[in-house]
């Protein structure tokens, strides 16, 4: 190497470390989560130069400049028309009233009555209900998905939406720009040309060349005529119905009727304002239901704006409130320290805590990261079940035969801190019983991970898991 080349390389080396140290100081001054700060320091040390690119795309915060602020969120929620029963909180079991208050304060999530609830654990049944809902629409159809692909399932739904738009039904669709980045723009344009209102969330032309990539709308919501709605983990793609790579797809959706649908509607219309700058409101979008059952739900949203993470905060409170059992399902398990400690605390307090994750998910890296977290929870007595019946994509929590949650939220850093997520927290014995039965049915397709098996992992696997864990806040 010539002297000039050596000088250039030396200059680049010192320039890199000057920039890296400046960024590290900047991160520390933000008072960010310690785990995230350490993760970025490890990136700069072990992946020099390339680490700067990773930080540019995934580490810089565009929240203040490009995402709606906390004040705007509050104003939008206040302008949404919701008829709220002020006595509802007194009608749920007393031990959960503090949780309902927490959601009201952290996410302005009203406690709304449920006339009918159906837990859908078969994705083919989800597809049937979806097309039934679309077919029955008289006034409006609102859909929001992270993924909406132009395959057989997606094309069939597109045709159904177009047909309804031509009948004069208002049809609005929000899809995530990154989740659908492989879908040709002509697919969505064909819907627009037919009268469907279509918007993408935080449009990214080149997903890997923008730090907008970091903040995605992961919500899955369907609302028809303000009277019936669905929420859960399913997107619009063939693999959600037919499976993937020879594996069946196991997911959960929750169909709701009654005032609780207004919570789904509110979430959708706030996001609609984000993407279209058009405020849609009025009583025709928020009809008043009978509320004939002593069943209630709160539709809770979380986003990267502000400091409160309402959904994960709700999970932490559920773990603290649990007395008999709490069962959790998630496809990806990379939790933050607070949730992890809460999980262990519940188990060490005598609660039957069961965690179900896929034995093999659709992400090998996520599987390695998940395994690195399981040692602590196993030592605390948490029962970990590895689902081998296919791709487990269900995101559910059920507690003590009364309280349950179904939504889009994974138990990982991305869902907790970066994504726009939504989950329904339901106060109802029948829904809890159905989710409990579903969990126990899934458990038959699992194997229990033992402490001995976990400790006998190969040295190479343990090293790989520990290394990937360093980057779990970034995955």
Go through the PLM ranges and name each one.
Residues 322-324, 332-354, 358-359, 363-365:
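Helical hairpin unit composed of two closely spaced alpha helices linked by a short loop
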Residues 1-313, 317, 321, 361, ...:
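N-terminal localization/anchoring segments of enzymes in phospholipid and broader phosphate metabolism
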Residues 384-388:
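Active-site donor-binding acidic/aromatic loop of nucleotide-activated sugar
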Residues 395:
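Catalytic-core elements of nucleic-acid end-processing and repair enzymes
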Residues 369, 381:
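CN hydrolase (nitrilase-like) catalytic-core segments centered on the catalytic cysteine
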